[in-house]
Amino acid sequence: DYMARSAVKWLLRLGVNVLTMSPGKKDYGHHNYPLERIEKAIAWLRSHGNAKIGIAGASTTGTLALTAASIFSDISLTIAMTPSDFVWQGFMQGRKDGCKEWPIEGESLFSYGGKPLPYMPFCYKHPDYWRMIAEESKRTGNMIASRKLFDDSEAVHAITGEEFIKVENICGRLFLVGAEDDALWNTAKYIRRIERRLAEKPHSCEVEAVVYEHGTHFVFPEGMLKTMLPVGSALFVRLAFSAAKKYPRECKAARIDIDHRMTCVICD
């Protein structure tokens, strides 16, 4: 995965040893991803002299980072960009009946101990799931717009306690970042729910949560984005998301601020 490898390069420049997950061949979906892989990665890093263990992710892997950190106490730094605060239904990507993505019945984003974690099901089934995303993307002028999918699904199925991520179990430091104008899901609402949950429950982690008015789904550190796209990174974001086209300066300012904040968190 090119974006993941680029993120690794950015982290390596900060002097951090990095392992990264890899998508399956011809399967870029997320469904019943075994958290044992994270568990084994932690053990491998420990056995090779790494005293501090952190996890970072963006988008669906931002949710993965939160979920893993809530289960594995060896993780002492968690960075989640545009996460959700709950686990949702697993999905596949590819080509099926003219659709590029579809939900998988009975499967969660993640599994542990051979069992899918409890998840919020999508209210749209195949092929309506992708048709709705495609229609919303065209209507809003975004590369992809699935926010309505998540809003409608939560309206139909109130998220249960088991489906929410137990963020109060996260150890060490927790850094959350998102933007109000995220076109994929309402990460700003989810981040604020995490803050409320932590305010209501005993926890040991030190949390820093930042939500920008403008930043799109690509709330990457500016240096990381430029590593991914050395030429034309800002143009790519503007082409991908209508909010970046309307507010390019604000989005870039957010990425620069994220770069500073995240670098400080990692190097502390």
Segments the model singles out, each with a brief description of its role:
Residues 181-185, 216-218:
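Acidic catalytic loop of the alpha/beta-hydrolase fold
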Residues 192, 196, 200-268:
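C-terminal catalytic histidine-bearing segment of alpha/beta-hydrolase fold enzymes
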Residues 170, 176-178:
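Short beta-strand/loop motif that positions the catalytic acidic residue
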Residues 55-58, 81, 177:
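Short beta-strand immediately N-terminal to the catalytic nucleophile in serine-hydrolase-like folds
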Residues 62-73, 78:
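Short glycine-enriched nucleophile-adjacent loop
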Residues 22-54:
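Catalytic nucleophile-loop/oxyanion-hole region of alpha/beta-hydrolase
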Residues 3-21:
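Short amphipathic alpha-helix adjacent to the substrate-entry channel of hydrolases
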Residues 79-167:
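Accessory cap/linker subdomain of secreted extracellular hydrolases
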